[in-house]
Each structure stands twice: as structure tokens, then as C-alpha cells.
């Protein structure tokens, strides 16, 4: 099993991508998650569960995050996901953070 946490909207230089956009931050966070999975020898297909933390969760946040989930994962067998609204994350500019659990063959 692989456990990955702390996937946020940072790029490789620690710049925050999409400062005011849940959609853009979600895209960056899922891109970072994909890179983290590749570093373990796995892929996004190996992920079985997600925990998605969203600051000040509103319906439009769900629409944005849902769109990125559909872009990122197969609709046939997506990972189980739990979405959690929070008041803040480690950096005041983070709007989303992702944790994942994966099972590698």
C-alpha cells in the first residue's frame, strides 16, 4: 500500500498555481498526485481512496473539483472519495489538499 498526503497547488518551485481558483488548484494538486504516484512506480489507476479537503466548501467548489476528478480518473472504476470542508489549510492561499491511498500490484 502507498499513502500520499499533502498534495496541493504548489508547482515544482513552490509557487501556488490558481491562487483564487479551486478549479486550477485542483488541477495542479491532481497533477502533483500523479507525479507522486509515478515516483512510487504506480499510476493514478492504483489509487483506491481519496480524501479531498476544500476550504470554505460551497456548491461551486464541488462542481469544480468534480470536473477535475472526471478529467483525471476513469468513470468506470473511480477511487472512493471523501470530500471534507475545512476552515483553512497549511498555507492561507491553499484552497484544496488531497490525500490518497493506493494499492500497487
Model-derived features: where do they sit?
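Short, polar/acidic, helix-capping and beta-turn segments at strand->helix junctions
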Residues: 1-105
Amino acid at each position: 500500500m502507498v499513502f500520499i498526503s499533502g498534495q496541493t497547488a504548489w508547482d515544482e518551485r513552490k509557487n501556488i498555481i490558481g491562487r483564487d481558483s479551486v478549479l486550477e488548484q485542483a488541477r495542479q494538486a491532481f497533477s502533483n498526485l500523479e507525479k507522486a504516484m509515478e515516483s512510487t512506480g504506480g499510476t493514478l489507476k492504483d489509487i483506491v481512496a481519496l480524501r479531498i479537503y476544500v476550504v470554505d466548501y460551497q456548491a461551486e467548489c464541488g462542481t469544480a473539483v468534480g470536473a477535475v476528478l472526471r478529467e483525471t480518473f476513469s468513470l468506470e472504476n473511480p477511487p472512493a472519495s471523501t470530500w471534507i470542508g475545512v476552515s483553512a489549510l497549511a498555507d492561507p492561499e491553499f484552497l484544496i489538499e488531497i490525500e490518497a491511498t493506493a494499492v500497487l500490484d
